Design a protein with these regions (language model features):
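NTP-dependent nucleotidyl-transfer catalytic core
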Residues: 1-470
Length: 470
């Protein structure tokens, strides 16, 4: 979730700074993790499909990943008991049990068959992957995230192997006696990096080299920004060096936009234990909470059911996105659903409500026949608060520029909050529609309109909608 929200916001901000941006995604659609789900479905699925189960395809496949892990752990536990009874130490018994687990051996055999192009395995793989892709598409659409191109590891890893062999021929890499291919990065202060295993199978680095090659061929890029968690910092340091060695001009300027882990009050999000915090469930929970909170505060009064549902969606997703994006991406963070949906403080709903409040002012002004001028009327004596608001609005372009230079969506988020906070103080302290001086009234309405415009632009850069009424 944090990955997609950060990547989407970053793409918007970089584009707003005048750059042509291509949004791509890589799906790891091959490997042992896929085979685990496939094998579990084959053994325990009884032909279950998304249609027969009523589940999203990605959820169903995820369930079988969890199923594999549960059966595997039970198998390892049973084998460990057997080996310890034979006199082995706990660590020895565990290592032997994991190595000899029939279930894991079957998964590895399935992977070998996949690599060899076995028709039955490939058919099962295509079917289950299509379930996952359909589920992903639904989630991305709801999240408001899109891509110009999606790459699949199954199509890129061979390109990577080809590029590694090319590097080997040119003397950039070396081969060990077991046939594995390595890069010697000691001159760069790093270690030796495996690029191809002795049996010729690829590693993650191989796939990333292949994907980079395809991106470079598909688009006239001069910079690549990878949005990946901070546990991969070393990986991307190495990838940058390898791409440079292989002749990609932008290799040295590769940017790893590294971000920290998101935790919930209960703990980190996990997958193998069956305690995953699903993005779809989280979005649904946020929308439901937004509706409940908005109703309690009377913010949905007078709206049709359809309008109320749309406001709940906008507020719920806005709360989720803003809470994540306001934090410096490099830091670990704890996501608190209740705190994020508060209509007061540094939250998405507070900003959205202020925007809706300004739209209400502008509607009433229009109903009164007031036309907002393009320029501020002359001869108006401005207060310090009004001058401050004008300056904050004028600062928006510089803020967007800074956010682009620093690759920091949080700069936009916190600027927008500060602007809204100042406007609310202004709204509280000064009459707008009831101001007796007509020129001052028109000025304050125009100022309100400009604040609303900047709030909308800022939130849109973060991928957040703002409602016209609430």
């Amino acid at each position: 979730m944090r990955n997609n929200l950060l990547g989407n916001a970053l793409a918007n901000i970089v584009a707003a700074n005048g750059n042509k941006v291509v949004k791509t995604n890589i799906v790891n659609d091959r490997g042992i993790h896929i085979c685990k789900s496939m094998l579990a479905w084959k053994k325990y699925g009884n032909g279950e499909t998304p249609e027969t189960s009523g589940k999203k395809g990605d959820h169903l496949v995820g369930d079988y990943y969890v199923s594999f892990d549960k059966h595997y752990k039970a198998e390892v536990k049973e084998l460990m008991a057997k080996f310890t009874a034979q006199g082995m130490s706990g660590d020895e018994a565990k290592a032997k049990a994991e190595a000899e687990s029939p279930l894991m051996q079957e998964a590895r055999e399935m992977l070998v068959k996949w690599e060899a192009g076995d028709p039955e395995v490939r058919g099962l793989w295509e079917m289950m992957n299509n379930w996952v892709y359909a589920g992903f598409d639904e989630t991305y659409k709801k999240m408001g995230v899109s891509f110009d191109k999606i790459y699949y590891e199954s199509n890129t890893y061979l390109e990577g192997k080809e590029k590694v062999m090319e590097g080997l021929e040119k003397g950039f890499f070396y081969k060990k006696e077991d046939g594995s291919v390595w890069a010697d990065l000691t001159a760069e202060g790093l270690d030796h990096k495996l690029l191809l295993r002795g049996d010729g199978t690829s590693v993650y680095m191989t796939q990333d080299i292949g994907t980079a090659k395809l991106r470079f061929a598909d688009y006239p890029i001069n910079k690549m920004i990878y949005v990946v968690g901070n546990e991969q910092n070393y990986h991307f340091q190495v990838l940058s060096i390898l791409l440079d060695k292989l002749g990609f001009e932008w290799g040295k300027s590769l940017v790893h936009f590294s971000y920290g882990m998101v935790e919930l009050p209960e703990g980190k999000m996990k997958s193998r234990e069956g305690t995953v915090v699903d993005a779809d469930d989280l979005m649904e929970e946020m929308i439901a909470t937004a509706k409940e909170t908005s109703q309690e505060l009377g913010k949905l009064d007078g709206l049709t059911q359809e309008e109320a549902d749309d406001i709940a969606r906008i507020v719920g997703l806005g709360a989720l996105k803003y809470f994540i994006l306001k934090v410096d991406a490099r830091k670990n963070m704890t996501f608190n659903p209740k705190e994020s949906i508060d209509f007061n403080g540094n939250t998405g709903p507070f900003i959205q409500y202020t925007y809706a409040r300004i739209q209400s002012v502008l509607r009433k002004a229009a109903e009164s026949g007031i036309v907002i001028p393009e320029q501020i009327p002359a001869g108006i004596e401005l207060s310090e608060k009004e001058e401050g608001l004008i300056q904050m609005v004028a600062d928006f372009a510089a803020v967007v520029k800074q956010a682009g230079e620093d690759y920091s969506p949080s700069i936009i988020a916190n600027y927008t909050y500060d602007l809204v906070k100042e406007y609310n103080q202004f709204y509280h302290d000064y009459s707008i529609l009831r101001e007796e001086n007509e020129a001052v009234k028109v000025f304050r309405i125009a100022l309100s309109a400009n604040v609303a415009k900047v709030v909308r632009l800022g939130m849109n850069l973060l991928g957040i909608e703002v409602p016209s009424r609430m």
